[in-house]
Amino acid sequence: MAQQVIGRVILSLNQYDTYDHWRNFALTHGVDLDGWYQNQCWDLPALLWYQYGLSLQTKPGGDGVAYQCWTISRYANAQPPFISIDGVSNIKRGDCLVFGSSSIAGTGHICFADTDYSGRYWDATYNCWRLNCLGQNQGQGISWYTPSNIVGLNLSGFLGIFRNTNWQNAPTPSGTTIKTKYPWVLYADRLRKNRNIMI
């Protein structure tokens, strides 16, 4: 069960200094920063902006929707350490992604890329690419106001990227490489060679 965070709270630096730390925090907490509508998608990135003394704006005066973080307030939200970037192919793990209005979410959506864009996951149903994303209130079949989870989202409504330049964008973790030159491997190779055993 996720621990609920309500209001503007200051986190420990080790909860948001890297994407992996932020991800660990997010997956164990529900965030309702503004006290409106419980855990909205906007609340999670807004809490991150707050840690840097910034406000993630939807529109001047507030009370907007997620896609307005890009369409109306892109430049207001791209304050250091955040920069705005265009283009799906530029998505890196840890980037904050903004999506436009769709039949699934008329308010748009805002979340974090949990993998780099690779162009490998084609969704034939929606004729678009998919990407694993970390966010709140997302995914089919969930109840509204769900705390953070990771789901594959289609990128058809993608608008843009806010990148935290304080995070070193480490590549998406992949499987470990097997090293074949451990002493026991070398010994086994030598033993096979002496016995004329071929593998």
PLM-predicted stretches and their roles:
Residues 1-62:
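N-terminal capping segments
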Residues 193, 197-199:
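Cysteine-nucleophile amide-bond enzymes
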Residues 39, 105, 177-178:
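A generic "functional-site adjacency" signal
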